[in-house]
UniProtKB/Swiss-Prot annotation:
Classification of source organism: Eukaryota, Metazoa, Chordata, Craniata, Vertebrata
Gene encoding the protein: Per3
Assembly behavior: Homodimer. Component of the circadian core oscillator, which includes the CRY proteins, CLOCK or NPAS2, BMAL1 or BMAL2, CSNK1D and/or CSNK1E, TIMELESS and the PER proteins. Interacts directly with PER1, PER2, CRY1, CRY2, and TIMELESS; interaction with CRY1 and CRY2 is weak and not rhythmic. Interacts with FBXW11 and BTRC.
Listed transmembrane segments: none
Tissues showing expression: Widely expressed. Expressed in heart, brain, lung, liver, skeletal muscle, testis, and at low level in the spleen and kidney. In brain, mainly found in the SCN, hippocampus, piriform cortex, and cerebellum. Lower level of expression in the neocortex. Expression exhibits synchronous oscillations in liver, skeletal muscle and testis.
Pfam families, sorted: bHLH_PER, PAS_3, Per3-like_PAS-A, Period_C
Effect of I367E: Abolishes homodimerization
CRY binding domain, as annotated region: 1035-1113
One Gene Ontology cellular component annotation held by this UniProt entry: cytoplasm
UniProt motif Nuclear export signal 3: location: 399-408
Disruption phenotype: Animals show altered sleep and behavioral activity whitout changes in total activity or vigilance states. They have increased wheel-running activity and reduced REM (rapid eye movement) sleep and NREM (non-REM) sleep in the middle of the dark phase. At the beginning of the baseline light period, they have less wakefulness and more REM and NREM sleep. Mice spend less time in wakefulness and more time in NREM sleep on the light period immediately after sleep deprivation and REM sleep accumulates more slowly during the recovery dark phase. They also display a depression-like phenotype.
Name assigned to this protein: Period circadian protein homolog 3
Comp. bias (Polar residues): 428-441, 501-530
CDD domains to which the protein is assigned, alphabetical: PAS (cd00130)
Residue span of motif Nuclear export signal 1: 54-63
Length: 1113
């Protein structure tokens, strides 16, 4: 039963069922009730009439239902479709009205009158009798002007056309296409096109097609296809005071291409594009007169629907060939029969090509170029279809699914992806011209193409390229790490060098052979495709980012002379590394016989910038992993390793010869960073010194002098447990020279293990530094923001010489000589004061000075400010207390004398390379010099202060030499590994190491007694009123702050990514803490700093194996 008749049922039954009953009642009752009966009867008649009108409207609406819906529409479907049409028209009307005269761009807009429009229309329509011009308003939608021949073309009256909306003339199924192509924002101005008409033969506007009818009854209307070109104009009329935006359309009627005037046979060509699912994506406008369909009729529908049922299976074979020759020039296949709009069939000779997505390697769409071979029987392709073609939707769906699954396979052809020689549908005509498809599409790929590469061949080629690239990468890494060593270090001679050279030469020859074979492979195969080049590029990027474990763990500065092939081997055991280290020391011991005379001549007093860059790059190599494997060395080996070597000749050679440009390297970046930091600090200091308060700040900095002592002895494990920031800015610990004559001169095992990996010092002709010349270490790395090369000297000999040593060192370094007393040091100019580094020894204090160019951390204040470079660890810890009470008192007296005369000495050290530490940090409450003197007595005990977290580094402090800043940074060492303050250890270290759970407050009180007198507030009190900032921070209540935070969290909660249940299960298999909804526990690593062995060398090796990711160079 048709639901269309549902509204008529109650209306039709009502008068028949209820009418007689009412009449019978009126006959039995009196005349007073007759009046009520007549009124109710009239109401029923009105109801019936309204019901009949409703049925007529619904039937009329069903006529406008889209023709694509082959099923009979119901009343509900018709009403919904009508509602959607109303909403669409209303939305477009609102959009046009919102533009108004101000919505469109008004630059260079020409306003036309109605007379001008008439002249324009007659000018462009007089050449073609099937063309007319129509202008409709964007605000009202009504026609403002229409040509005279429009009534003849549309077979309608002229008066009717002037009073109607232009959209009312369109077929309902074409309204959406009309609105999509006439949006004012995308229409070109008419005057702009006419000005460039001589340059362009075609109009810049994009044409579209619609069916338009004239007047008459709706049932007798006949829609004809028209080609429309829209333009934007502004019309001024008497009804509108302001110019009104309008659309000028040039409408041309389309005739069948097989009727007069016929399209030539050799020009009956059009192109189509469809998806792997056989759905039309694009249809050439040349197909409209040849097939009778408008582009919007075909787009979105299946191509199989329009093919003859017997030709549909051919599409499977066609798409199989499309997959086989994807990316190649077009190929031809069997002709197919295509159904036109009037129900007749035309035979098409088609050539097919495809576009391959270069990323997914799948066919994205298929391009068909079709040429009509035979015309349809009924040449009027726009005629109404008499009989409906029977189509089996089930068969079409099965074929579509089969073709879609076929084209889901990736393409492995070696040819370049894309259209091949076809280009695109627009550029296609440049290749194919107007000739037949068989003549223009080129030869078939079976004849001239190379044999297709199989998947196994592609994989073999990729693997071969990968092996070659990996070997080249290893060779480049070995060359980059060995070359600086050869220039800055004394190369060992012997069997090891020959073995390294032979292995390196073997690798070079092998790489050359592989490269040559790769070149032969490239000559044999055809030109590489985009996919092959992309694959090779991915392999190269993978190899570049890939870090070999051997390169990580065996990157030893200045001793890494092994070849890349040896680096690829696993890490040797502890015993083998010990033997290698001892053997290396024996070799170098034999070579430390030649005297050094370069210091006398002063060939190289300072290093060049290139040497700085190279050494800073070398110093970034990590020696922490090998130091963990190296066992304690014998005392004589340590003594030999610590003796100065003559390396000045190499340094002068580097400075004189210069360096070859190697591009952007770590050394170049380090030098650049050093330069930028130096410039920044210099500008900041200059700004402060030139301010009105420069003198006050300079004086204030001298009044706040503090002191501290330094101890070397941090292990590589300590630097590795530091966290992410410490890993980025690692630095090498200085080898601590030990006086072997002293009974307590025994190094910590981990500190001793560092020595083979450090840059060793050259031999000296005289055991005394006062002899032939002072030999400096090749690179003294200061724990500053960047590694720096700084001149230094053997501390063990300098400590025993006293005043003469200071004078000799000053002469050798090119600086004013140091006298025994502190007055000579205080007499240095401010430039030297800024770059002073204080080194405390057990016997006599020594204050080496560097030139200003080597300033690792220039002061942020005035000259002589207390903000100095980080103190260099220069002394190894003593495992046993060897100094007597008398020597302790002497150290204390010397320190007090120096601290009184040297107000610029400060213990506010900063951490390694961190740009954020350039900012001023407020110190913790510090104790005064008097309080330190009171606490530093002959009976003062030494304390080992452990941070809040046992997993972090521990610092052993000395009671008589501790300062207030040491208290601040020792407490902060638990949360950050950037602290570089070290303190000398004594016999109390073993006691504290056994009981590490002492309260932090108690340890702090014992280590730093009375450290609460001087604070930052005393400095603020002495600061003038005009210097202090005068703004006030507004008060914020606790409840208000919590409320705002809660609102922000709630607003951000919806933006947070959520895991799906499957992802949670997958993660839970690896991370068990996800089930409990808790944070993962942090791993704890304990580092040993005391001289007693907190963990054996084997434990260190286990930590290295468990945490390979932290062991980075």
């Amino acid at each position: 039963m048709d639901p269309c008749g549902d509204p008529a049922v109650p209306g039709g039954d009502c008068p028949q069922t209820r009418g007689p009953g009412l009449q019978g009642a009126s006959g039995q009752e009196g005349p007073l009730q007759g009046t009520c009966v007549d009124s109710s009867h009239s109401e029923h008649e009105d109801r019936n009439r309204m019901s009949e009108e409703l049925i007529m409207v619904v039937q009329e609406m069903k006529k406008y239902f889209p023709a694509e819906r082959h099923t009979k529409p119901s009343t509900l479907d018709a009403l919904n479709y009508a509602l959607r049409c109303v909403h669409s028209v209303q939305a477009n009307s609102d959009f046009f009205q919102s533009l108004g005269p101000r919505g469109a761009h008004q630059a260079d807009v020409t306003v036309y009158s109605l007379e001008d429009l008439t002249a324009l229309a007659s000018e462009h329509t007089s050449k073609n009798t099937d063309t007319f011009a129509a202008v409709f308003s964007f605000l009202s939608g009504r026609l403002v002007h229409i040509s005279e021949q429009a009534a003849l073309i549309l077979n309608s009256k002229r008066g009717f056309l002037k009073s109607v909306h232009f959209v009312d003339l369109l077929a309902p199924q074409d309204v959406r296409a009309f609105y999509a192509h006439t949006a004012p924002t995308q229409l070109p101005f008419w005057n702009n096109w006419t000005q460039r008409a001589s340059q362009y033969e075609c109009a810049p506007a994009k044409p579209f097609f619609c069916r338009i009818c004239g007047g008459g009854d709706r049932e007798k209307r006949h829609y004809s296809p028209f080609r429309i070109l829209p333009y934007l104009v502004h019309v001024h009329s008497s009804a509108q005071p302001e110019p009104e935006p309008c659309c000028l359309t040039l409408v041309e009627k389309i005739h069948s291409g097989y009727e007069a005037p016929r399209i030539p046979v050799d020009k009956r060509i059009f192109t189509t594009t469809h998806t792997p699912g056989c759905v039309f994506l694009e249809v050439d406008e040349r197909a409209v007169p040849l097939l009778g369909y408008l582009p919007q009729d075909l787009i979105g529908t299946s191509i199989l629907t329009y093919l003859h049922p017997e030709d549909r299976p051919l599409m499977v074979a066609i798409h199989q060939k499309v997959l086989k020759y994807a990316g190649h020039p077009p190929f031809e296949h069997s002709p197919v029969r295509f159904c036109t709009q009037n129900g007749e069939y035309v035979i098409l000779d088609s050539s097919w090509s495809s576009f391959v997505n270069p990323w997914s390697r799948k066919v994205s769409f298929i391009i068909g170029r079709h040429k009509v071979r035979t015309s349809p029987l009924n040449e009027d392709v726009f005629a109404t279809r008499i009989k409906k073609a029977a189509s089996n939707d089930k068969d079409i769906a099965e074929l579509q699914e089969q073709i879609h699954k076929l084209l889901l396979q990736p393409v492995h052809a070696s040819a370049s992806s894309g259209y091949g020689s076809l280009g695109s549908s627009g550029s296609q005509e440049q290749h194919v011209s107007i000739t037949s498809s068989s003549e223009s599409s080129g030869h078939c790929p079976e004849e001239g193409q190379h044999e297709q590469m199989t998947l196994q061949q592609v994989y073999a080629s990729v693997n071969k390229i990968k092996n070659v690239g990996q070997q080249l990468y290893i060779e480049s890494m070995a060359r980059s790490s060995v070359k600086p060593v050869a220039e800055t270090c004394v190369e060992p001679q012997g069997g090891d060098e020959q073995k390294d050279f032979s292995s390196s030469q073997t690798l070079k020859n092998k790489s050359t052979t592989d490269t040559g074979s790769g070149g032969n492979l490239q000559q044999e195969q055809p030109s590489s495709s985009y996919q092959q080049m992309n694959c090779i590029d991915s392999v190269i990027r993978y190899l570049t980012s890939y870090s070999l474990p051997a390169l990580k763990r065996k990157c030893i500065s200045c001793t890494n002379t092994s070849s890349s092939s040896e680096e690829a081997k696993p890490i040797p055991e502890v015993d083998s590394s010990q033997r290698d280290t001892e053997q290396l020391l024996d070799i170098r011991k034999q070579e430390t016989t030649g005297p050094s005379t370069d210091i006398e001549g002063g060939a190289a007093r300072t290093l060049s910038t290139a040497a700085l860059s190279v050494a800073s790059g070398i110093s970034q190599c990590s020696c922490s992993s090998t130091s963990g494997h190296a066992p304690p060395l014998q005392s004589e080996s340590v003594a030999v390793a610590c003796k100065p070597w003559a390396l000045r000749t190499k340094a002068s050679h580097l400075a004189a010869g210069g360096f070859k440009h190697v591009g952007l390297t770590a050394a170049v970046l380090s030098a650049h960073t050093q330069k930028e930091e130096q410039n920044y600090v210099d500008r900041f200091r200059e700004k402060i010194l030139t301010s009105p308060y420069g003198c006050y700040l300079q004086q204030e900095s001298r009044n706040r002098a503090q002191y501290s002592c330094v101890q070397a002895g941090s292990t590589a494990k300590h630097s590795r447990c530091a966290g992410s920031e410490r890993q980025k800015h690692k630095r090498k610990k200085l080898p601590a020279p030990v006086d072997t004559s002293s009974p307590g001169a025994h190094l910590c095992p981990h500190v001793t293990g560092l020595l083979p990996d450090e840059q060793h010092w050259g031999p000296s002709a005289s055991p005394s530094p006062l002899g032939a010349g002072l030999a400096f270490p090749s690179a003294l790395v200061v724990p500053s923001q960047t590694p720096y090369l700084l001149p230094s000297f053997p501390l063990q000999d300098m400590a025993s010489q006293g005043v003469g040593v200071s004078a000799a060192w000053g002469a050798a370094a090119g600086c004013p000589p140091l006298s025994a007393g502190p007055q000579a040091v205080a007499a240095f100019p401010s430039a030297y004061v800024d770059t002073l580094m204080t080194i405390f020894l057990h016997n006599a204090p020594l204050f080496p000075l560097w030139p200003p160019s080597f300033s690792p951390y220039p002061s942020l204040g005035a000259a002589g400010s207390s903000e100095l470079a980080p103190l260099v660890p220069a002394m190894a810890p003593n495992p046993e207390p060897t100094t007597s009470g008398h020597s302790q008192r002497r150290v204390e007296e010397n320190w007090e004398a120096h601290s009184e005369e040297l107000p610029f000495i400060s213990s506010r050290s900063s951490s390694p390379l961190q740009l954020n530490l350039l900012q001023e940090e407020m110190p913790a409450p510090s104790e005064s010099a008097d309080a330190v003197r009171r606490g530093a007595g002959p009976d003062a005990k030494h304390h080992c202060v452990t941070g809040p977290s046992g997993s972090r580094s521990r610092h052993c402090t000395s009671g008589e030499l501790a300062t207030a800043t040491a208290q601040q940074e020792s407490a902060a060492a638990s949360g950050s590994s950037a602290s570089s303050i070290y303190f000398s250890s004594t016999d109390y270290a073993s006691e504290v190491s056994e009981n590490r759970q002492r309260p932090q407050d108690r340890q702090r009180d014992e280590a730093l007694p009375g450290a609460a007198e001087e604070s930052i507030w005393r400095m603020i009190e002495r600061t003038p009123e005009c210097v202090l900032m005068t703004y006030q921070v507004p008060e914020r209540g606790r409840e208000e702050v919590l409320k705002q935070d809660l609102e922000k969290l709630q607003s951000m909660e919806q933006q947070q990514p959520l895991f799906s249940p499957a992802q949670r299960e997958e993660l839970a298999k690896v991370r068990s803490w996800i089930h409990s909804h808790t944070a993962p526990q942090e791993g704890h690593l304990q580092s040993c700093v005391a001289c007693e062995d907190r963990g054996s060398v084997g434990d260190t090796a286990e930590v290295l194996e468990q945490h390979p990711a932290e062991d980075t160079s």
